[in-house]
Regions:
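ALDH superfamily catalytic-core signature
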Residues: 1-98, 160
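Conserved C-terminal structural/oligomerization subdomain of aldehyde/semialdehyde dehydrogenase
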Residues: 88-199
């Protein structure tokens, strides 16, 4: 439920929404079932008619998402419906899309969640290292393994067994690394980031 909420809050139009999931192949089928159940629990059998399901910022953005989905490859496990005139994009899960597709190379900014499988944690780390440094890295599982992964993979922020929550604290610095941004803000970090120290 946390992953679905984090991906679909504001229709996925948040900078810290998960862009994709890397899932061990031994638990992928079970996770896909749970993700679909979470969508139904939150918005019913047809989220289009749920009064609290958000919409895309405009029709052009909905059209862009439709284009991303049409060329993604892989298997659409659920969702996939895009209605440009209503700015509606259904909560969508795409299993093992083409890694070279626009869906995997661009920031999605929509309630579309690609799920990629792996056999060894090192494969997941390699996949993360091959991509731009993420603004947020979410790890679900044993915290020790998550810490080892974070030692290998640079990111702006990290959360273990949760999503988006690292941004909610005004005391924790927030920002990216490389392509995901430079500098930190929130609380004391804001003063340091936006101050010009002179000697």
């Amino acid at each position: 439920a946390r992953i679905v909420w984090g991906k679909c809050v504001n229709a996925g139009q948040t900078c810290v929404a998960p862009d994709f999931l890397l899932v061990h192949e031994s638990v992928c089928d079970r996770l896909l079932v749970e993700l679909q159940r979470a969508v139904e629990r939150q918005w019913g059998s047809d989220p289009r008619f749920a009064v609290d399901y958000p919409r895309m910022v405009d029709g052009a953005h909905a059209r862009r998402v439709a284009e991303l989905l049409s060329t993604a490859g892989g298997e659409t496990v659920c969702g996939g419906e895009v209605l440009e005139e209503e700015r509606y994009v259904a909560p969508t899960i795409v299993l093992n899309p083409d890694p070279q597709s626009r869906l995997m190379r661009e920031e999605i900014f929509a309630p579309v969640l690609p799920v990629l499988t792996f056999a060894e944690l090192s494969e997941a780390a390699d996949a993360l290292l091959a991509a731009d440094r993420p603004l947020a890295l979410y790890y679900f599982g044993d915290e020790r393994e998550g810490r080892r992964l974070c030692e290998r993979v640079p990111s702006g922020g990290v959360a273990f067994n949760d999503v988006v929550m690292q941004v909610s604290s005004r005391r924790l610095p927030f920002g990216g690394v490389g392509a995901s941004g430079m500098g930190r803000y929130h609380g004391e970090a804001s003063f340091e980031c936006f101050s010009n120290c002179r000697s």
